[in-house]
Amino acid sequence: MLDVNNFEYMKIGLASPDKIRSWSHGEVKKPETINYRTLKPERDGLFCERIFGPMKDWECSCGKYKRVRYKGVVCDRCGVEVTKSKVRRERMGHIELAAPVSHIWYFKGIPSRMGLVMDMSPRALEEIIYFASYVVTEPGDTPLEKKQLLSEREYRVYREKYGKGFSAGMGAEAIKKILADIDLEKETNDLKEELKSAQGQRRTRAIRRLEVMEAFRNSGNNPSWMVLDVLPVIPPEIRPMVQLEGGRFATSDLNDLYRRVINRNNRLKRLLDLGAPNIIVQNEKRMLQEAVDALIDNGRRGRPVTGPGNRPLKSLSHMLKGKQGRFRQNLLGKRVDYSGRSVIVVGPNLKMYQCGLPKEMALELFKPFVMKELVGRGLAHNIKSAKRKIERMAPEIWDVLEEVIREHPVLLNRAPTLHRLGIQAFEPTLVEGRAIRLHPLVCTAYNADFDGDQMAVHVPLSAEAQAEARILMLAAQNILNPKDGKPVVTPSQDMVLGNYYLTLERENAVGEGTIFKDINEAQLAYQNGYVHLHSRIAVFAGSIPNERFTDEQRNQLLITTVGKLIFNTILPKSFPYINEPTKFNLEIETPAKYFVDTTTDVRAHIAAQELIDPFKKKILGNIIAEVFKKFHITETSKMLDRMKDLGFKISTKAGMTVGIADILTLEEKHEILEKAHDTVEKITKSFRRGLITDDERYERVIGVWNAAKDEIQGKLILSLDRLNPIFMMQDSGARGNISNFTQLAGMRGLMADPSGRIVELPITSNFREGLTVLEYFISTHGARKGLTDTALKTADSGYLTRRLVDVAQDVIIREDDCGTDRGLTIKAIREGTEIIEPLEERLEGRYSRKTIRHPETKEVIARENDLITEAIATQIVDAGIEEVTIRSAFTCNTKHGVCKKCYGKNLATGTEVEVGEAVGIIAAQSIGEPGTQLTMRTFHTGGVAGDDITQGLPRIQEIFEARNPKGQAIITEVGGEVVSIEEGRDRQQEITIQGTDDRRSYNIPYTARLRVEEGTIVERGEALTEGSVDPKALIRVRDVLSVQEYLLAEVQKVYRMQGVEIGDKHVEVMVRQMLRKIRVMDTGDTNILPGTLMDIHTFTEANRDAILSGSQPATGRPVLLGITKASLETDSFLSAASFQETTRVLTDAAIKGKRDELLGLKENVILGKLVPAGTGIGRYRKLKSEVIKETAEVTDEITNI
């Protein structure tokens, strides 16, 4: 038996007529499908049972042989083989064409492959194939030339003149004859000769022809196979015909297209037998050609064939293309059994690793397991009765169900799955009702809320799948976000509010300055109303079970609040007692100033102290990160649950409400507005007198109103009571921000009009007072724009993620160390004077390339190939080192992936990355997922003649697609000193740069803003004006590494401006994929074709062989490809075809006879194999498990894994 999942590679090629006949099980001669009375397939028709196999299992057509025992018998009456009906999905038929027909893919694609092989223009080919002109196939000894086109009249004239002295023909037959006559060897050698002298257009054409010729030569395909003599007919189950109610039939469009081909073919055969006049035969041949074209690719040439209702029919090509095509609909995304979906509701009392599964749903999902267990326990005699029991919902099944789902994790997924945290595993618990219960802390990762979101459940079946779900995907394991290594499960909303309220301090609260002997006493006093949560009190420090206190501190009093005492009970004992929201307190110890001797006057001491800020959302996040660093997964997930419970409990007790009385308006608002109106009036006067331009007036007016709004906002914040519920909500980070409050109580400020331009009429009212009709109207613009932008952005961002995933899907950690001697020198990324990404953030979790020493003491901070931890990174920055050389994905030598050392730490686990980790896909998701948070619009930068700089999502697309940027900067091609900046004609400026050996001048347009002045020293490739550099121009004047660094910095700028943090390594992986190819300039003595795009590794290998054999190596220059182009240029044709331009990719691959080595993930998913990543990678698949010893029954909780 052939193991379908065990093969090395997949190859595609052209099929010869004999090959097509060998696939076939018989010829389809009639266009009939099924008999309308008996509903049985017609013999020799498109559904014929004799050709394709029986309709019913183990039963021939006439019913003579029934049952399995006749397996393999061919019925003597009807000729049908007795076998399974499933063969109707795999058996093919064929149609013997009465005249050869050209294959539209090879004739019509761009460039026309047929045209390149024959060296004819596509126009000429079309005339021949569709019977408009004759072509000379054999000139004989006449003055005609081979492949010369003749019109009908010319043909007749030459026939009379030369008689049988030459042969010419039309249609695909003539093409076939010419193709068959081509001598590939001779043509190839001629083209190689021509290349030596040819220039310009002729050279390009010669290279393209040579490429196709070499492809045919190397693949063993015969050019004449581009013309079909036999047409394969795909199996009937793949183009089914089904009966609808009311006796009508629905059928696949392919059947209609096949019927047209068969009808025309049969008519042509009859005409040829009758010896019909040539013109009629020619017309029929042309119609046959068009019918086959429509079958293969309808609509590629001329008007598409339409079905009822003027709808174009779906041809074979359309079955593969697009989102609904075979590749994306059925091969890359399949529907799976053992799954369900339902609405989600919050489950605040669940543990971190649990989810609530509705009983009915669980019963259906785990049905086979329950049935097996029922039979096993003797509650049912056989599977059938077990099934009946379940359908009747007998009471005894519930206990069995609980037993079955215990320790059997399920996967929960929420669409859209933007990153890997969109699918996580949970341990199910049964709940009443029909809604899935979700743990509140995982909502951030799923981006879920409970306003009607739905989620899907999947059951991992095999033991291996369950183990992977539990060990790798359990929600308690996914605490860190893969994009930046920060915790993704931070408390939100009510939980934040509760912990904020708990840790507030209040002056002169009830019982301030009371001294307690321990926590219990303090809590008792609080419950009886003697002290408040916010009262500052003293507690005997020795009673607090904290291992960080010194012996001296244990004998002192700790100044804290009741709330903070309660808050600290949720933290591990060896964690510092957190009394203030500072980094010092978090990472090192509780500051000494909070400890006082027992003799101190506590009340006076407290009265002299400032109030400490409560713990906001950010601090809670830092606490989680710190706990994770020190105690890892189990302890963190328990702590998170405690923090969640505490937050919910206290926010319930706090009873925060928002009433209209909480929104207090500002007394001085009227004065501020008056002042602003006066200033605007003055600006308008200056404009009327012609002192300033309209643009300047506009900018200044906007400035005035923004200043007014800011002033109101500032005074509002100062006038607010710290205990105002709205203020507490926004200050804690639970919900809303200060600008929401300003709009409620201050003024709404300026709005944007539909084009995104700011309207200079401000909205001076706030929501508390109410808006005037005009103000309301102005504000509708902005609201509408916000919503449309969001909708458009989501689609754009999703498509960006898809392209990123496609280009990086085969980047996997393949080995431990690639042994490279190159590295990337990094420093902090800056925009002007502002630091966008500091050096320590870029260093942490990377391997050093060289030994790093302290500049003064010369002591070693990190050795070569050491992992730089957070502590080492801080040391490096503190030592004043500004740039460090690290191992980077840019310089990694690993083929088809990167190595562990060049990648560094896995951000999602905080540990070293494992071999087999699919870092490409993680990188793509990390860049794509925050895409929805980026803005859409191009910002209008200040300044009168300011260019629009693209930012946000459009800028990210521009970078990754390597497009020419908007507002492009002019770069210098020489390094040296700027010697002069002069004003040329048309108010242009001319910059002259004196290099070491040459001098260049650049004309700068009048509107551009300069970045250099006379005397500036510039490097090659440096920008002379403000704006974005075109990376394709940069790669021409600088090396690859500078382009990579530039792209990395640009991507980071966009994301950091929007407050999104992404690890450098993700961008590095993507940029590495854009620069994988090299364009061959000079072929040397290798047999590479000039102008070919090839993988750098393949290129180096070809050159290595050339150098070793002592011949001249080829030279090439690196090429920067946009991600779409890079995806289509991948070595895997399956991956490229399933991405975009399916027909073009397949045409090309077929001619080249390409092999797909199945290295990426996508190709393997398409073929239904295990992906070569994670546990599916070769080195893990070969491991065999063995039992060392049986373990005792484990009763421990799942969290301890």
From Swiss-Prot:
The residues the record assigns to binding Zn(2+) 2 are 818, 892, 899, 902
- What is the required cofactor set for this protein? Mg(2+); Zn(2+)
Q: How is the cofactor bound?
A: Binds 1 Mg(2+) ion per subunit. Binds 2 Zn(2+) ions per subunit.
Which terms under GO biological process does the entry name? DNA-templated transcription
Where is Zn(2+) 1 bound in this sequence?
60, 62, 75, 78
Please list the GO terms describing molecular function.
DNA binding; DNA-directed RNA polymerase activity; magnesium ion binding; zinc ion binding
Identify the enzyme class. Answer: transferase
Database matches in SMART domains = RPOLA_N (SM00663)
Entry keyword Cytoplasm: no
What Enzyme Commission number does this protein have?
Answer: 2.7.7.6
**Catalysed reaction(s)?**
RNA(n) + a ribonucleoside 5'-triphosphate = RNA(n+1) + diphosphate
What the entry lists under CDD domains is as follows: RNAP_beta'_C (cd02655), RNAP_beta'_N (cd01609)
Binding residues annotated for Mg(2+), in chain numbering: 449, 451, 453
This protein's record includes keyword Cell membrane: no
Q: What does this protein do?
A: DNA-dependent RNA polymerase catalyzes the transcription of DNA into RNA using the four ribonucleoside triphosphates as substrates.
Family as reported in the entry's similarity comment:
Belongs to the RNA polymerase beta' chain family.
Q: What is this protein called?
A: DNA-directed RNA polymerase subunit beta'
What is the source species? Listeria monocytogenes serotype 4b (strain F2365)
Q: What is the lineage of its organism?
A: Bacteria, Bacillati, Bacillota, Bacilli, Bacillales
